[in-house]
Amino acid sequence: MVLSPTTIQHSITSCSWNYFDKKFFLKQKKLIVEKTILYQNKKILYRNIGNGNPVMLVHGFGEDGSVWHAQVEFLKDKYHLIIPDIPGSGRSEMINDMSMEGMAEVLHSIIHEENIDTCTVIGHSMGGYITLALVESYWNHVNAFGLFHSTAFADTEEKKQIRKKGIEFIKQHGAFEFLKTSTPNLFSPKSKSQIADSIEDFIASLANFSPDALVSYYEAMMKRPDRTAILKNTKNPVLFIAGEHDNAVPLDDVLKQCHLPEKSYIHILKNSGHMGMMEETEKANQILEEFLDNK
């Protein structure tokens, strides 16, 4: 049973994310509304900006909501954007159930708090896994969804072994050492050269990540089931954005499942690895806008 948040705290700020240009938002008088809900006595923070049809952008592993900064700036004039920090990331606390299903319940509570009937949900990487769990349980609240460098397949045994090694590294060396080592591999060789400063800044922003959260995410990813049935059965539009140089969610895996939905849209970012919102920002923005406008 989902518990509705009993307490909600509101604060208004020009922006609290390092990646945002605060002056830009003040100049445009576009203020981000920060909200904190209590989900089973744990604080969950999310941000609202803009008006229009609601769109939730769900970040992935080793990130927080600020990873969507360029997309927020691009889409905020046309849509009501909802940007959560998932449990354990950013300024949201870990919850008791850190499974994909447990974190999907948090997203549902945010939708409930916003009094939204239906919204579009776009999930990056692990955020896509959470999105699929949300659609599985609350399909009536999601009118379209997108998998941005994400997959409906369960982990292979090989992938599980890689995650287990990652867990051991995190326990021995800490979260930031792990992220400093692993995050550069998410970018294509071209991106590492062309946006090196942005990648360095992004990694620096992860310094305070919780090792317990990262371990919980890896454990949840290893346990998540195959959800290709969601793709097969949905009547709603589904967006796939894949990176040609993505080692985390290989292009071949995406191509094997993008035909499953009745209404499927597939876009390949030719110069991206796993971080297309940063690597090919303009193209990623255009893809999202086209999907949101025409779904």
Report residues per predicted region.
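Active-site loop/oxyanion-hole signature of alpha/beta-hydrolase fold enzymes
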Residues: 47, 70-73, 82-122, 137, ...
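Conserved loop-alpha-helix segment in the C-terminal half of the alpha/beta-hydrolase fold
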Residues: 233-272, 278
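Serine-hydrolase catalytic-loop signature spanning alpha/beta hydrolases and amidase-signature enzymes
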Residues: 60-70, 81
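Conserved alpha/beta-hydrolase catalytic His-Asp/Glu region
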Residues: 154-161, 173-233
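Catalytic active-site module of serine/aspartate enzymes centered on a nucleophile-bearing elbow/loop
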Residues: 265-295
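The conserved beta1-alpha1 loop
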Residues: 58-60, 242
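Conserved hydrolase catalytic core segment
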Residues: 117-156
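Alpha/beta-hydrolase fold catalytic core
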Residues: 1-54, 76-79, 112, 116-117, ...
